Design a protein with these regions (language model features):
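Short beta->alpha junction loops
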Residues: 76-84, 202-211
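Extracytoplasmic "Venus flytrap"
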Residues: 35-54, 78-84, 107-108, 174-183
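Envelope-exposed proteins and targeting segments
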Residues: 30-33, 71, 143
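Short, well-structured alpha-helical segments in soluble
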Residues: 84-99, 161, 213-220
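Signal peptide-proximal N-terminal region
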Residues: 53-75, 196-197
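N-terminal secretory signal peptides and thylakoid transit peptides that target proteins
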Residues: 1-16, 20
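C-terminal segment of N-terminal export signals and the immediately downstream linker at the start
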Residues: 22-40
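Extracytoplasmic ligand/sensor domains, especially the bilobed periplasmic-binding protein
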Residues: 85, 96-203
Length: 220
């Protein structure tokens, strides 16, 4: 999923605003420390690198314009390597060791499923661009915010196109092995069935990111 300049600026602004809700006040001339969990390497880096470009641009423009209330923004970056375990380790270091005011990321739902509960326990504000519906919950995760559509919203648009525009009545749904892939299949299949489509094949976790070969599934 790509990110526009406007989205990046909005996300950075929202993250910084959220940081004032939970963390203690610090000196007015100190930079605002923003923890950042992009996937710069690994299978999700094709998305992570694009989001990183937008995020870096947003910070540069905010700082060049005088910062936030006169304070510069400092990104403290930890590459998740597209790995939920490394994402959790990075989040723990940022919220405890680095004492950041807010965390932006991870950029992958599978990683966020592991990170969101951890940051909620430390009352660290978080903004992420991940789609799995359960990744924002006002009761469980009151300091977690999303700057992207949910699986329900994406699924509604995609399924409408498949059933109403393409007029397909038999549909196969497959996913990768990530938490995002499993959650997506579990969300989209009932939505397709509700629109009258027959799901002839449901394949949860049939391939890993970066290794998909469509031939066997197409033949089946």
């Amino acid at each position: 999923m790509s990110i526009t300049r406007r989205q990046a600026l909005g996300s950075a602004g929202a993250a910084i605003a959220a940081s004032s809700l939970a963390k203690p006040a610090i000196a007015a001339n100190e930079p605002i420390r923003v923890g950042y969990l992009p996937a710069l390497t690994g299978p999700s880096s094709s998305t992570g690198i694009g989001i990183n470009r937008g995020t870096q641009l947003a910070v540069q423009e905010i700082n060049a314009a005088g910062g936030i209330n006169g304070r510069q923004t400092e990104l403290i970056t930890r590459d998740t390597q597209s790995d939920p375990t490394k994402a959790v380790n990075g989040a723990a270091e940022l919220s405890h060791g680095q004492n950041v005011s807010v965390v932006f990321g991870p950029v992958n739902s599978g990683e966020s499923l592991a990170v969101v509960p951890l940051l909620a326990r430390t009352n660290t504000p978080q903004v992420h661009p991940c789609w799995v519906d359960t990744l924002t919950d006002p009761q469980k995760y009151p300091m977690c915010f999303r700057n992207a559509p949910t699986n329900q919203q994406i699924g509604a648009a995609a399924n409408r196109y498949v059933v109403d525009v393409l007029k397909r009545k038999k549909v196969a749904v497959i996913s990768d092995t990530t938490g995002y892939g499993t959650a997506s299949v579990n969300t989209y299949v009932p939505m397709l069935q509700a629109k009258g489509a027959e799901v002839v094949y449901q394949g949860n976790g049939r391939f890993t990111i970066g290794t998909y070969a469509g031939g066997p599934f197409t033949i089946r």
